[in-house]
Amino acid sequence: MVCNSQPVRMDDQPIAALILAAGFSSRMKMVKPLLPMEGQTVIELVIGLFQMIGIADTLVVLGYAADQLIPVLNKQGVSYVINEDYRRGMFSSVCKGVEHLKEGCGAFFVLPADMPFVRAETLQKLVCAFRETGKAVYRPHYQGRLGHPPLISATLIPAILAFKGPGGLRALLAAYEERCVDVACDDPGILIDLDTPEDYQKYRFPYKPSRY
């Protein structure tokens, strides 16, 4: 499988991105998507990651502190939807986002808004695998550990919306293990989220990932 560093083609089976930004940020004590980083906010870095590879259909799912995030998204020209049930957890935001994907979407990424260190090259590898193999789920892994974002075929949308069991998206995708492809990536950023003030201080300055 060969992938290059050029922007991925989106003309056949368009690919979308869901950014999950509805959570409480309870351990951070601040609104995580609005934390300053690299001269921007964290949410702007995450949005820019998808723009970098040519994904035009990016949808941000909001909930807690939506009023603070909306001006940033409007400035970026990015679409958003508000999950009124965000207190029910991240999977409720996944479902809200999936409900609002544009018709004709071939596959979609799901990335929490507190993970700004994923590399564009990783996304390109996942898209390349999707184009070449036609499976249902593509999961990046680094040194044997699965990370974010998965790339999920739109064929699983009905199953996602119908799922009522425990464990959320991870449990649902595990039920389709035989249709999953794990893609090796030289990218520790797929494992790094900004969950606590200590995480933010640790990665704010010393961690300088290649975005490509």
Cite the ranges covered by each PLM segment.
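Conserved beta-loop-beta/alpha segment of the NTase-like Rossmann-fold superfamily
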Residues: 87-159
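Acidic helix N-cap motif at the loop->helix transition within catalytic regions
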Residues: 67-73
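Short, structured coil segments at secondary-structure junctions
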Residues: 54, 74-77, 152, 156, ...
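Conserved donor nucleotide-binding strand/loop of the catalytic core
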Residues: 77-88
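N-terminal glycine-rich phosphate-binding loop and ensuing alpha1 helix
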Residues: 11-63, 67
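Short aromatic/basic micro-patch
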Residues: 36, 117, 150-151, 182, ...
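Conserved alpha/beta core of the MobA/IspD/sugar-nucleotide pyrophosphorylase nucleotidyltransferase superfamily
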Residues: 2-13, 158, 162-212
